[in-house]
């Protein structure tokens, strides 16, 4: 049972507010929550907070805060599950969940909340069941068309137009407009991995972790059966080996409750009849043993003089992806000593950009090809430059406040674990005469990629 539900933007602006029981402090509660959240030291944001006899439970999604409040003794895990399901529902009915789609579909969001919750009690969170009661149509930024193709492919990768789904294809509502008779039978399958890495100053690997998900967004009738074939060498745990190759191993795996695993052990095939909308078919984790080299290596060189306050940092970034692969939207963040007053730079290519901001160096590279390396030479004036405690200036001892460096990036058509989707098959009988469209995408991106200087 919840008392209130509201959605805040990343700046704390209220986008949606719903009071179910009238036992709270009105809209001021949303402002109180944001004040408490931003007032925490070090940017900490616990998902459960208690203040003034009221529990605040929240999740973050696409820069938005989805918050539920209650004055009762309710399991926080059940409320977190409810918020997660509400985020999925809003994405299903609005096309995607972000500040723009919420602002364009305020009436639809309130109608959904009225059907999902009655006096703060959950009635249903089923996309299929709710479609019988929701009358408001979603307002989308532009109508979807399979002919609206650009030269930029999935995740920004260049490819042939006739082989690429448009970028807006998977971000439209699962329920078509009543005036739109051209609704396509389509299914989107994404294999998404988040990579966490910690590298020591001498280049040795201290920690590596891969969190992966197979996400499905279906625009097919709910009775359609979907068959997903994974890499046959896929194995779970260190004791299980399949075939004669090195295998593709993960430590842990979990499946959605609707997945039929009858053929998983023998052929690595998943069967399911998903409802219309979005769900996570499978989650998996891999730690400490990647089958391929890390995507990036950073080779820093630091020279500094305490007397003159001159700091020179040379960074060489090497991409160890296969030559046919590439990384996109690479951003390097390097904290700097306090008091930097100027920056001069020499970059190895004209499409790079570097600037100072919030006490750090920001180095942006739009695209890096596998097997290549880029470099940047950065010289700064830092009055009052200081070395580590009890140590003077030394080539092996960086000045106080420098580093560690962190990288963020996207790797389209690449998985760090090596897991691939072999095939995606659909039952045509439930789709009628229309030929369903299938889109399979693989993507890895950084979660916390940290290199000590």
Swiss-Prot record:
GO molecular function annotation: protein domain specific binding
GO biological process per UniProt: autophagosome assembly; Golgi to endosome transport; Golgi to lysosome transport; intracellular protein transport; protein localization; protein localization to basolateral plasma membrane; protein targeting; protein targeting to lysosome
Gene3D superfamilies cross-referenced by the UniProt entry: 3.30.450.60, Mu homology domain, subdomain B
Main location: Golgi
Keywords on record: Endosome, Golgi apparatus, Membrane, Protein transport, Transport
Transport recorded as keyword: yes
Region of interest (Disordered), residue spans: 383-403
Protein name, entry field: AP-4 complex subunit mu-1
Organism annotation: Rattus norvegicus (Rat)
Gene responsible for this protein: Ap4m1
């Amino acid at each position: 049972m919840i008392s209130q539900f509201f959605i805040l933007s990343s700046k704390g602006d209220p986008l949606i507010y719903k009071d179910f029981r009238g036992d709270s402090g009105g809209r001021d509660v949303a402002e109180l929550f944001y004040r408490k959240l931003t007032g925490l030291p070090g940017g900490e944001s616990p998902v459960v907070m208690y203040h003034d006899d009221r529990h605040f439970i929240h999740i973050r999604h696409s820069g938005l805060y989805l918050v539920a409040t209650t004055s009762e003794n309710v399991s926080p895990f059940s409320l977190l599950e409810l918020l997660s399901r509400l985020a999925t529902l809003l994405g299903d009915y609005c096309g995607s969940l972000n500040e723009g789609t919420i602002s364009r579909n305020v009436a639809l969001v309130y109608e959904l909340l009225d059907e999902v919750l009655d006096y703060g009690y959950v009635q249903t969170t089923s996309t299929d069941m709710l479609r019988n009661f929701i009358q408001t149509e979603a307002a989308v930024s532009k109508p979807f068309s399979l002919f609206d193709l650009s030269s930029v492919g999935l995740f920004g990768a260049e490819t042939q137009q006739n082989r690429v789904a448009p970028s807006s294809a998977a971000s439209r509502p699962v329920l078509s407009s009543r005036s739109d008779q051209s609704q396509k039978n389509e299914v989107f399958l994404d294999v998404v991995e988040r990579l966490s890495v910690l590298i020591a100053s001498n280049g040795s690997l201290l920690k590596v972790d891969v969190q992966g998900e197979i996400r499905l967004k279906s625009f097919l009738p709910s009775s359609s059966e979907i068959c997903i074939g994974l890499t046959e060498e896929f194995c779970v745990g260190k004791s299980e080996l399949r075939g004669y190759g090195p295998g593709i191993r993960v430590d842990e795996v979990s499946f959605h409750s609707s997945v039929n695993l009858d053929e998983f052990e023998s052929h690595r095939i998943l069967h399911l009849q998903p409802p219309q909308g979005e769900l996570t078919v499978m989650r998996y984790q891999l730690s400490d043993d990647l089958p391929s080299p890390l995507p990036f290596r950073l080779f820093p060189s630091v020279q500094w003089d305490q007397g003159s306050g001159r700091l020179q940092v040379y960074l060489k970034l090497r991409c160890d992806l296969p030559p046919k692969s590439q990384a996109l939207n690479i951003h390097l963040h390097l904290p700097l000593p306090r008091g930097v007053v100027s920056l001069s730079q020499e970059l190895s290519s004209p499409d790079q950009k570097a600037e100072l901001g919030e006490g750090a160096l920001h180095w942006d590279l739009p695209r890096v090809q596998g097997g290549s390396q880029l470099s940047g030479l950065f010289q700064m004036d830092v009055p009052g430059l200081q070395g580590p405690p009890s140590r003077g200036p030394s080539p092996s001892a960086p000045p106080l406040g420098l580093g560690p460096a962190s990288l963020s990036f996207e790797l389209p058509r690449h998985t760090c674990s090596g897991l691939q989707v072999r095939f995606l098959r659909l039952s045509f009988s439930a789709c009628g005469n229309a030929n369903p469209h299938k889109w399979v995408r693989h993507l890895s991106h950084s979660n916390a990629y940290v290199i000590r200087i």
